[in-house]
């Protein structure tokens, strides 16, 4: 993304956090977008449009807002939890930023430029089958041919992909929540905050679940030991970089979340926010004064899969461990285990209509 486009994106993102002149100027278009979103969901729910039912439970992790909220680490954590429960999960994702002519399996040795950065990170971290293709229903069916043992599907960032029916929907937010609460383009919402869902997951270390909102859960990302990009066997605690001249760079949906976690570990980094899914085709550190002056450059795991060609011993990767409220993990396990026996005996079917079921009333994330 060029600098002017990046600046425009930053401007719009900032406007989405308030109800200023920009929001009111865009409001007529926002009302139209909201109407289209509601009609589209209603159409799939009531069988106006064709959708596909898979012979297994489908769990969707997505968001009603534009931008990253931590879906990838959530999918990794859920895949690991389902595996520990004795299930055999598979993951289907779009493959953002890559051109695909047919469904493609993501292997730990794949290139991010071929399959996308987030699917590659999931494949490496979760050790489960991961496939990518914009048509998630076709992608899932293709995956089942190659991996017939898969008995539960995780759909990464597929909340609005209604062509694939689902059994359990998780709507994610981060500390920005729903912004100004308005639909695109006046605000960040793809769908209303009141949209029904089975659970709300908030990626914010300061969030605490309460009995008053029983289906709203929290997630935090704990920093692990950093490892050197050129030599992953070299590892040290992030706190070991305190007192050093540090540049932190992040090409994720909310770079400030990464920077804040480093400050919480005792670092005082210079920061380099990059566009989400930045491809690193151009070296952002070359000629950057803060990078030239830095003793250490810290990047995210998501960015690391695109930086493997860089030969710079100053670059260290900061992995995170997602920690999700146990209540949500237990709820998903129960829901999936209750459906797996039926799923095993049910033949695959394409072309069914309607969503699998009505979800319970959603919790407004405000």
UniProtKB/Swiss-Prot annotation:
It catalyses: a lipid A disaccharide + ATP = a lipid IVA + ADP + H(+). Keywords: ATP-binding, Kinase, Lipid A biosynthesis, Lipid biosynthesis, Lipid metabolism, Nucleotide-binding, Transferase. GO terms for biological process: lipid A biosynthetic process; lipopolysaccharide core region biosynthetic process. It is an enzyme of class 2 (transferase). GO terms for cellular component: plasma membrane. Pathway: Glycolipid biosynthesis; lipid IV(A) biosynthesis; lipid IV(A) from (3R)-3-hydroxytetradecanoyl-[acyl-carrier-protein] and UDP-N-acetyl-alpha-D-glucosamine: step 6/6. Residues 343-366 are annotated as: Disordered. Transfers the gamma-phosphate of ATP to the 4'-position of a tetraacyldisaccharide 1-phosphate intermediate (termed DS-1-P) to form tetraacyldisaccharide 1,4'-bis-phosphate (lipid IVA). This is Tetraacyldisaccharide 4'-kinase.
